[in-house]
Amino acid sequence: MQLYHRYLKLPFNFEKPTLYDSVELKDYCEFIYFKDEDLLTEPILNFIDSIGLYRIQTNSVYSAPKDGIRIHSDTPDLSDKVKLSFSWGSPDSKTIWWEPIDRRKVKVVDFYESHMTRTVKCSKIKMATIPERIRLFLKGKKIGPLTKYAWAKEKDCERVLARTIDRPSLYNVGRLHSTWNPSNEGRWTLTFILGKKRNKKPLEFIESLNYFSDFIIKE
């Protein structure tokens, strides 16, 4: 049994937030944070609450045409944290999951900007290395809030699963994964980090299979 992804058939439809259409689109992938009330996510939050869960955080990601996000996990360690995901746009954009051949090759890095492209636009990655901190200090610039991610090089990983994320999904973000959008159309993804109401701990993928058992599409 694979523990990376499941498609869902939910008891409601949720259209792409109109707020996304007001965003100036870039030629690279970008993480953007919006308030739930501005995204009108109440139907999703009510559903999450009805099955004994709660939203820890809401994230929005824009996947630019012919661009992708390098191999990473959404956590500073390799785990099985799960997100509930909704996507709109390119039907060809894929998420690929990887397992490290040698865990010692997995690095934890501080990012102060979330442009983690893995293509020719990789220069947009902003890692908070010591030389970079010194460069910013000398320029009189403050380093923004830091986010820790685990990441690895493709040559140090084994590809284990690829899925087109074109419908509601459960998505293991604690394992290494990357994205690639080969089309000429962008893609928006709205994700929710989930927690269990009974103990306030983050939901793990294998646990999510029980909470969402009535809504998982069998493959």
Locate predicted features.
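Non-heme Fe(II)/2-oxoglutarate
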Residues: 1-62, 68-69
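Long, compositionally biased interface segments
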Residues: 191-219
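Catalytic core of non-heme Fe(II) oxygenases with the double-stranded beta-helix
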Residues: 63-168
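Short loop/turn segments at secondary-structure transitions that flank enzyme active sites
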Residues: 89-92, 177, 196-198
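Well-ordered, non-membrane alpha-helical segments in soluble/globular domains
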Residues: 38-45, 128-131, 209
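Short beta-strand His + acidic residue motifs that chelate non-heme Fe in jelly-roll/DSBH
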Residues: 70-74, 171-183, 191
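A short hydrophobic beta-strand segment most commonly corresponding to one strand
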Residues: 82-86, 168-170, 185-202
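Short conserved micro-motifs at the rims of enzyme active sites and ligand-binding pockets
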Residues: 97, 182, 201-204
